[in-house]
């Protein structure tokens, strides 16, 4: 699953969860 989150600076960061 691919989720988009915001960093402390408000930057769009993507973390990939491999199931």
Swiss-Prot record:
It is found in: Secreted. One of its GO terms (cellular component) is extracellular region. Conversion of fibrinogen to fibrin is triggered by thrombin, which cleaves fibrinopeptides A and B from alpha and beta chains, and thus exposes the N-terminal polymerization sites responsible for the formation of the soft clot. The keyword NADP does not apply. Keywords: Adaptive immunity, Blood coagulation, Coiled coil, Disulfide bond, Hemostasis, Immunity, Innate immunity, Secreted, Sulfation. GO terms for biological process: adaptive immune response; blood coagulation; innate immune response. The modification Sulfotyrosine is found at residue 4. Cleaved by the protease thrombin to yield monomers which, together with fibrinogen alpha (FGA) and fibrinogen gamma (FGG), polymerize to form an insoluble fibrin matrix. Fibrin has a major function in hemostasis as one of the primary components of blood clots. In addition, functions during the early stages of wound repair to stabilize the lesion and guide cell migration during re-epithelialization. Was originally thought to be essential for platelet aggregation, based on in vitro studies using anticoagulated blood. Heterohexamer; disulfide linked. Contains 2 sets of 3 non-identical chains (alpha, beta and gamma). The 2 heterotrimers are in head to head conformation with the N-termini in a small central domain. A long coiled coil structure formed by 3 polypeptide chains connects the central nodule to the C-terminal domains (distal nodules). The long C-terminal ends of the alpha chains fold back, contributing a fourth strand to the coiled coil structure. This is Fibrinogen beta chain. It comes from Sus scrofa (Pig). The gene is FGB.
């Amino acid at each position: 699953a691919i989720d988009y989150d915001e960093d402390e600076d408000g930057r769009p960061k993507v973390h990939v969860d491999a199931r």
